[in-house]
Amino acid sequence: GFFAFIPKIISSPLFKTLLSAVGSALSSSGEQE
């Protein structure tokens, strides 16, 4: 089913790039407060 694709999505370079971008955005917004 759908859940079989989750490990592939998580291990994909694009997901890691997106995750790091979101993480840096969250940390930067947290510093502003």
Curated annotation (Swiss-Prot):
GO biological process, one term: monoatomic ion transport
A cellular component term, taken from the record's GO annotations: membrane
GO function terms (MF aspect): toxin activity
Cellular compartments annotated: Secreted; Target cell membrane
Keywords (A to Z) from UniProt: Ion transport, Membrane, Secreted, Target cell membrane, Target membrane, Toxin, Transmembrane, Transport
Domain of life according to the entry: Eukaryota
Any one Pfam family match given in the protein's UniProt record, by short name: Pardaxin
InterPro entries to which the protein is assigned, alphabetical: Pardaxin (IPR009990)
Similarity annotation: Belongs to the pardaxin family.
Function: Exhibits unusual shark repellent and surfactant properties. Forms voltage-dependent, ion-permeable channels in membranes. At high concentration causes cell membrane lysis.
Subunit structure: In aqueous solution exists as a tetramer.
Domain comment as written in the entry: Consists of a C-terminal hydrophilic region and a predominantly hydrophobic remainder.
Name of the protein in question: Pardaxin P-3
Source organism phylogeny: Eukaryota, Metazoa, Chordata, Craniata, Vertebrata
